């Protein structure tokens, strides 16, 4: 111990210089000496750096050896954790390196820290940290008081005063959206209004999770809304979906009503919000799992879905026109059921728009792909023409045929109905690969089974015919969304159904 204390300071300086020269870790995992890892032969593995330190106090010396993960190397070029430090009564010497077991060394000590401070110096040493801690605590209390932390707790009440300068008292979401569709650009609420709404929403409960993040039920001025919260990793998906929802003239009763998009920074992390209408029945997938449907209910679900897709696919020409849009991820989990028993299409994060003037498609730079179970044959075998917009519309039609099959199975006639199942449930595993789906759909040319009982009911017979014409291997032979909508409209009139 005394010999170590006598080691000159130049050696410590050279060690620190060597540490600074080796701060950038290699790509391969490091094996480091770890004095606490008794079960692993005193060895740990990291993608960052090996670390060793010695802390000297007035009465003892503490040695520490371990791994530092790459994520903890802040800033990257000169991490704080690798810098020596000193506090009253203790001195810590550190060394970081990036070679296997390079931290299996004993750092030199610099001698016991001196405590021989004069009265003035001692007062300054004590008062400085105390003042710093007090100021820091006051600052933290102020920040916490003025921010709404939404992830871990739900506030008891909203602060309506925040939106008064922009949105008058008594204004409802329906009023705002009506004003926007009749007198605005038709491309969504102004950004300031969107931000004002988003920042005065009170989250109530989490109602679902997905690959993008979470969905919450929230309240704005007593009205229920759905809040889709994307993690910061999914910024592209959030931006793309918000962009598509704000396409001119997109609003339609059978497409999920978009309200606002905002990025909310709570001081620790950024959350990306997408606010929309709330539908308590949830997705069509959830609805069909819980309930059977009547013939009328089946037709309403199918016709409203076809109406929403027909509006998406349709191009509206004019100064306030709308480009044709293909969904690319249509499935029962991305269709919501409204209170009146009709559907609206949601989750437009993968959608693509067609510019007819230049005949181009704005395919988003997004790593996500559609759901394998609902992929059309030409998508599965990679024969789809990505430059031809009609190809994407035809793939949507194939997927809608599968959704219709899910709905028709739950149609109860005389108390007889099938259990809810996903398409191809009897032919592929629960999470099929593209190869498994390709073998069934493209090679074996199989499609979901249509029960014989459907032939005894006119409505089910029409539904079965539509499905078959949606499932053709040749995409060009499939029905269009508009044709399906017209066929189902005629069926609803025959059945005396009022939509």
UniProtKB/Swiss-Prot annotation:
Transmembrane serine/threonine kinase forming with the TGF-beta type II serine/threonine kinase receptor, TGFBR2, the non-promiscuous receptor for the TGF-beta cytokines TGFB1, TGFB2 and TGFB3. Transduces the TGFB1, TGFB2 and TGFB3 signal from the cell surface to the cytoplasm and is thus regulating a plethora of physiological and pathological processes including cell cycle arrest in epithelial and hematopoietic cells, control of mesenchymal cell proliferation and differentiation, wound healing, extracellular matrix production, immunosuppression and carcinogenesis. It holds the Pfam family Activin_recp. This is TGF-beta receptor type-1. InterPro entries: Activin_recp, GS_dom, Kinase-like_dom_sf, Prot_kinase_dom, Protein_kinase_ATP_BS, Ser/Thr_kinase_AS, Snake_toxin-like_sf, TGFB_receptor. The lineage of its organism: Eukaryota, Metazoa, Chordata, Craniata, Vertebrata. Residues 1-29 form the signal peptide. A motif (FKBP1A-binding) lies at residues 189-190. The active site is at 329 (proton acceptor). It is an enzyme of class 2 (transferase). Gene3D superfamilies: CD59, Phosphorylase Kinase, domain 1, Transferase(Phosphotransferase) domain 1. It comes from Bos taurus (Bovine). Phosphorylated at basal levels in the absence of ligand. Activated upon phosphorylation by TGFBR2, mainly in the GS domain. Phosphorylation in the GS domain abrogates FKBP1A-binding. The chain crosses the membrane at residues 123-143. GO terms for molecular function: activin binding; activin receptor activity, type I; ATP binding; metal ion binding; SMAD binding; transforming growth factor beta binding; transforming growth factor beta receptor activity, type I.
